[in-house]
């Protein structure tokens, strides 16, 4: 499966400008099967959901559907959504064959996200081209129990607005998640400065199941990151090094 990830700046709380920007990027994109966008790719990481949130079937989801159909590609990215009186940081998954979503479970309290958005309660794993992909958002990366591989996924996706001062944690934890879960990991972060003056260095990466980079970006630089992943290679490694057989049993409560 061919992966493309967009490390990009974001126009602050400006859906139309961001959608136009990404439309142009996607039109220039080479052949790919899966496209991964940053967290809150239409607005930036805003704690003003009453200003930016859209309906569950809003313009961003319609745009994702259009892009998926036009380019015959699966596409994923998160947006602020209002549904049943609550706001969610919702990661949409749209492919030509299916559609799903994951609501961010771990809300970033240091920015007050937990006071503005409701937490999702369940993990979401989707299937595409023979791979099982687990959808996660930013702060979820810090919680290995929640994103632990229960022998139910092959690719772990993190979309993020992860600030530059904590870039070491971002890179280190992505590598750890790949190694401990024997899974490909895609980590996509934004670059530039947001409306609150917070800077983002990007450091987006696609890792193999050994934690080794298949593709990585230059910090602070907009980029299209591409790599190809192999299910046969992943299965071969898991058979030769079946660490999951010695994993401790646990359950989430």
Cite the ranges covered by each PLM segment:
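Cys-nucleophile CN-hydrolase/nitrilase-fold catalytic domain and related Cys-dependent amidase chemistry
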Residues: 15, 23-95, 100-101, 163-177, ...
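Extreme N-terminal starter segment of soluble prokaryotic enzymes
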Residues: 1-5
């Amino acid at each position: 499966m061919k992966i493309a990830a967009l490390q990009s700046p974001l126009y602050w709380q400006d859906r139309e400008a961001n959608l136009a920007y990404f439309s142009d990027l996607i039109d220039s994109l080479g052949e790919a099967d899966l496209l991964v966008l940053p967290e809150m790719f239409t607005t930036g990481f805003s704690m003003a959901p009453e200003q930016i949130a859209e309906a569950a079937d809003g313009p961003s989801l319609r745009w994702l559907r259009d892009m998926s159909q036009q380019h015959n590609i699966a596409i994923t990215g998160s947006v602020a959504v209002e549904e049943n009186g609550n706001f969610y940081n919702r990661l949409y998954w749209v492919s030509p064959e299916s559609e799903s979503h994951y609501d961010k479970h771990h809300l970033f309290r240091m920015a007050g996200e937990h006071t503005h958005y409701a937490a999702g309660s369940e993990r979401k794993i989707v299937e595409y081209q023979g791979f099982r992909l687990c959808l996660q958002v930013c702060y979820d990366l810090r919680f290995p129990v929640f994103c632990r591989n229960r022998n139910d996924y092959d690719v772990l996706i993190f979309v993020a607005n992860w600030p530059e001062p904590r870039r070491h944690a971002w890179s280190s934890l992505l590598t750890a998640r790949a190694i401990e879960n024997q899974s490909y990991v895609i980590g996509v972060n934004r670059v530039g400065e947001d409306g609150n003056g917070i800077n983002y260095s990007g450091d987006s990466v696609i890792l193999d199941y050994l934690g080794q980079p298949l593709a990585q970006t230059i910090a602070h630089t907009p980029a299209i990151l591409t790599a190809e992943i192999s299910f046969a290679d992943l299965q071969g490694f898991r058979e030769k090094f079946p660490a999951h057989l010695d994993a401790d049993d646990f359950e989430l409560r």
